[in-house]
Swiss-Prot record:
The lineage of its organism: Bacteria, Pseudomonadati, Campylobacterota, Epsilonproteobacteria, Campylobacterales. It comes from Sulfurimonas denitrificans (strain ATCC 33889 / DSM 1251) (Thiomicrospira denitrificans (strain ATCC 33889 / DSM 1251)). The gene is uvrC. Keywords: Cytoplasm, DNA damage, DNA excision, DNA repair, Excision nuclease, SOS response. This is UvrABC system protein C. Its main location: cytoplasm. Pfam families: GIY-YIG (PF01541), UVR (PF02151), UvrC_RNaseH (PF22920), UvrC_RNaseH_dom (PF08459).
Length: 600
């Protein structure tokens, strides 16, 4: 069936549609209240079947590449919105705008049902009328919480009240001591009120921290003074600079977008009880034009898709966007109350939008990430990538004669290594091909929870490159892949520097770049970081394995028998968990009992 025939048979139902090019690569995922009307709007049918002349250059180019169409019918536009958002995060279509800020932000909360309430941090929201939440905080939540307990005489630890005995915190005036002393509700409430003021007003918080810092310095407690100085700097850096204070209890979530020629930034600002308490931002690499409507949809859906927030605030945006009604319907269902997305009309609320736009422009202007030197653009051009790789995942494995086999994934995003996103893998496979396959399959399985990157880099040659491409194709995921390996000398690949050059493999070509080429240096830097991570994890795993092996050797189990066990069970943890019956299928019953008793 031709594309034209397929379009003419589309139902007048809500659903999600997917465009593919002639090679079967996914180009775009969209949603529709009516699949027939929406998809037909992309085309002119007479006198010639072609892209609609009213489309933007970006969408027109996409439609000209479209060869086949697939669609999924759902019950409502609301369901289509949710499915579209999920599929885009998993499958990374070429022409969809990809927003990676998919994480949940922490809140600081207090449970007022406790006799002496404490402040704690959480990402999981508990429904209770007694719990009050402050946030969300994109950064700095831990620093704020630590500062509260530094400056306010509250119960410092959860278990303190059960001891019925004064602890060190009371002696250093950081707790009123309700575990043993009589503390009135009024006295404790005073400390709670101060803590709440510090959470909502960063200026007062930083001022009080600086006062304590100077006190420590005057008393030659330089280590403590330095720690507070660093904390003040982190809290200060994390906040939008603003004099805005509504002197009211108003809450708002503000979303704005600004763009340059090749980059856009999404800025979120959170106002709670009339004060700006936190902000966050994300850079987006633009390609093939720019669709602000889609970016607003992705930004708002991505932020709220984790569940109902504890504080439901009106959402302010800088401009109207297509799909706003669908987003409001989705959020109303999620919030269990009417969601409100609006462009502010009053001067007071416009201040918030102006502030967010000012910060967005400043972020674009002052961006000092590595892409400013053009290296990522050059990488895209050299290797014919689909998009500029703002997020790159690099894979390597490490073992010693098949023992302590591990893999590592390093992550490079927006010009820096994102070590919080690194992953390490215990691998069961014996050869390097199977090890890489195991690692990549496990990463693909986690795409729903942690969306795919723009680029994979593998430490290996064309064989591993083709393996990765095959895995991605079978999963329907649209990611670029390159591989880097040492040139073979005397039929051997020498990793040691100076012995052989690095060769880079892409889907379409092989690259032997000069040693001085900065594009080679960039790929090597990412490969070396993954290798470092894999080696370090291997050393730790090997040390643990050696200690376990020594334990069994002391119990009379020979090294040959230990190797036999590892070949069967793969890891010492699996050996520990095995029953005597399972162990006796590999060794004799006497040895099985010795091993089992060794781990009791």
């Amino acid at each position: 069936m031709t594309l034209r025939e397929c379009i003419k048979q589309l139902p007048d139902s809500a659903g999600v549609y997917q465009y593919f090019d002639k090679d079967g690569h996914l180009l775009y995922i969209g949603k529709a209240k009516s699949l027939a009307k929406r998809v037909k709007s992309y085309f002119n049918f007479a006198p010639k079947f072609k892209p609609n002349s009213n489309l933007s250059s970006r969408i027109s180019k996409m439609i000209s590449q479209t060869h086949t169409l697939q669609y999924i019918v759902v019950n409502s536009e609301h369901d289509a919105l949710i499915l579209e958002n999920s599929l885009i995060k998993q499958l990374m279509p070429k022409y969809n705008i990809l927003l990676r800020d998919d994480k949940t932000y922490p809140y600081i909360y207090i449970d007022n049902s406790q006799k002496y309430p404490r402040f704690e941090m959480t990402r999981k929201i508990i429904k209770s009328s007694n719990i009050k939440y402050y946030g969300p905080f994109s950064v700095g939540a831990r620093d704020i919480l630590d500062s509260i307990y530094e400056l306010c005489a509250l119960v410092q630890k959860k278990g303190s009240l059960t001891s019925k005995k004064l602890c060190l915190y009371h002696q250093i005036n950081r707790c009123l001591g309700p575990c043993e002393l009589h503390v009135s509700d009024e006295d404790y409430q005073r400390e709670l009120d101060l803590a709440k003021e510090l959470i909502l007003n960063k200026k007062i918080l930083i001022k009080k921290l600086q006062e304590k810092m100077f006190y420590y310095a005057d008393n030659l407690r330089f280590e403590e003074a330095t720690a507070l100085r660093d904390r003040c700097e982190r809290i200060s850096r994390s906040e939008i600079k603003s004099e805005i204070d509504f002197a009211s209890s108003e809450n708002y979530d503000i979303f704005v977008i600004a763009s340059s020629q090749s980059r856009a930034v999404v800025v979120r600002i959170f106002m709670r009880e009339g004060k700006i308490i936190s902000s966050s931002h994300d850079y987006i690499q633009l390609h093939e034009g720019y669709d602000e409507d889609e970016l607003y949809q992705r930004a708002i859906m991505g932020f709220y898709s984790h569940g109902k927030p504890p504080i439901i605030a009106p959402i302010l945006v800088a401009s109207e966007f297509e799909g706003k009604d669908s987003i409001e319907e989705f959020l109303s269902t999620l919030f269990e109350k009417k969601a409100d997305i609006k462009v502010p009309k009053t001067a007071k609320r416009k201040q918030l939008i102006d502030l967010a736009l000012l910060n967005a422009a400043e972020l674009l202007k002052n961006e000092t990430k590595e892409n400013q030197s053009g290296i990522l653009d050059e990488i895209k051009k050299l290797f014919s990538l689909q998009r500029v790789p703002s997020r790159v995942e690099t894979f390597d494995n490490s073992h010693m004669s098949g023992v302590a086999t591990v893999g590592a994934m390093s992550v490079y995003e927006n010009g820096a290594f994102d070590k919080k996103s690194y992953r390490i893998y215990h691998l069961e496979a014996r050869d390097e091909y199977a090890q890489m396959r195991e690692m990549l399959l496990r990463r693909v399985e986690s795409f729903l929870k942690n969306p795919p990157p723009d680029l994979w880099i593998l430490d290996g040659g064309s064989t591993l490159l083709n393996l990765a491409l095959s895995i991605l194709e079978s999963s329907g995921v649209n990611i670029d892949v390159i591989a880097i390996a040492k040139e073979k000398v005397d039929a051997k690949a020498h990793r040691a520097k100076g012995k052989a050059k690095d060769i880079i493999y892409s889907r379409e070509d092989i690259f032997k770049l000069l040693d001085s080429d900065k594009r080679l240096h960039f790929v090597q830097k990412l490969r070396d970081e993954a290798h470092r991570c894999a080696i370090n994890f291997h050393k730790k795993t090997k040390l643990k394995s050696d200690n376990e092996s020594k334990l069994l050797t002391l119990k009379g189990i020979s090294q040959a028998k230990i190797i036999k066990l590892l070949k069967h069970f793969t890891t010492f943890d699996a050996i520990k968990e095995a029953s005597v019956e399972e162990l006796s299928t590999v060794l004799n019953l006497k040895d099985a009992n010795i091993i089992k008793s060794s781990y009791i």
